[in-house]
Amino acid sequence: MSFLLGFVFLMLSCAQSGQRVEQSEQTDQNKAEQEKMRRSMLFGLIADSRIETLSAFAVANDYSDLFGKDSGPILLFAPTNEAFEKVDSVTLRSWRDQKNGMMKRLIGNHIIKVDQLSDDLSIYLDKNLTALNGSTLKIIQEQQAYYLEDVKGNRALIGPNPLRMDNGDIYYLDEVLY
């Protein structure tokens, strides 16, 4: 009888120990996932008050997985809130209509998947870069300033000090390219 009681006690101890290890592993995994998310472009996009307008549009148009889970590397050329304020209200209203898909295409026009990230935009100079939506963009330099240029010749000034995240870099634009 005491042997049986000892055996039951041993089994219960092992089961509880196994549960604690499993809970600890889940907690460690959750912490790792949370840390990875904090270093993702999605976190940077949502946390940065300079690009709240773009952030809202990106989340509403299903770009969360790209910015949160894709390993990249990705360049996001993010029009600032001020850039969106320059767009006339009729155009902005048509972009907000998710049924026409215009905002999804517009955001895709500002995203480029690259082979490598660099602290220096000069490695991308005068190369045809293909945006996520299939359009062709170029980074050009005039004096000390860099610009993003589309095939129509529209340009946006690329601001200094990009936000560098694990899966890509967020550069700030003074214009929306459309």
What is the role of each PLM region?
Residues M1-L12:
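Sec-dependent bacterial lipoprotein signal peptides
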